[in-house]
Amino acid sequence: MSELKQAAAPEQALVVGRITSVYGVKGWVKLYSHTEPMQGIFDYKHWWLKTPSGWKTVELSQGRLQGRGLVASVKGYTDRDQVKDICGMDVYIDAAELPELEEGDYYWSQLEGLRVITKEGVLLGKVSQLMETGANDVIVVRACEGSFDREERLIPYAPGTYVLNIDLEQQEMVVDWDPEF
């Protein structure tokens, strides 16, 4: 059986996908990717897995599109019985490996947890997640301590229209949004 390499936790652990199941008999796995495009997960060759006994690392050997999904081969895993041990695990990278973005562009992970405040200074809550809807992305804002009320809000992620300012250092997003809505 292949051994996972013990490793220190990544500086800033970021989930980029999940190993969902075994694929074939030669130790390949099916993947669910959170990256955009989904094949972007293959840009990261060094993956961290959080196991009950701590952080472990694996190295991507090969990856490809297979039908509507992704499959990958991990170094040191050559048969389906070996990879069963890593199925169901999230795939992490160190956020420091992400490419630099242009000014005004953000990774979703940077926005999650920001306090959402109206331009009038009313705290609506914190960004709990973002959703892709087709027309535009949507910010899910959940109430937090000190927020205006206990309501969850869905606010279109439309910079310049509804999202007026993002300050990562202050952990705040200013929005043009009626707290009663």
Curated annotation (Swiss-Prot):
The keyword Ribonucleoprotein does not apply. InterPro entries: PRC-brl_dom (IPR027275), PRC_barrel-like_sf (IPR011033), RimM (IPR011961), RimM_N (IPR002676), RimM_N_sf (IPR036976), Transl_B-barrel_sf (IPR009000). Gene3D superfamilies: PRC-barrel domain, RimM. GO terms for cellular component: cytoplasm; ribosome. The keyword Cell cycle does not apply. Transmembrane segments: none annotated. It is found in: Cytoplasm. Residues 103-181 form the PRC barrel domain. One of its GO terms (biological process) is rRNA processing. Keywords: Chaperone, Cytoplasm, Ribosome biogenesis, rRNA processing. It comes from the Bacteria. SUPFAM superfamilies: PRC-barrel domain, Translation proteins. One of its GO terms (molecular function) is ribosome binding. The PRC barrel domain binds ribosomal protein uS19. Belongs to the RimM family. Binds ribosomal protein uS19. An accessory protein needed during the final step in the assembly of 30S ribosomal subunit, possibly for assembly of the head region. Essential for efficient processing of 16S rRNA. May be needed both before and after RbfA during the maturation of 16S rRNA. It has affinity for free ribosomal 30S subunits but not for 70S ribosomes. This is Ribosome maturation factor RimM. It comes from Marinomonas sp. (strain MWYL1). The lineage of its organism: Bacteria, Pseudomonadati, Pseudomonadota, Gammaproteobacteria, Oceanospirillales. The gene is rimM.
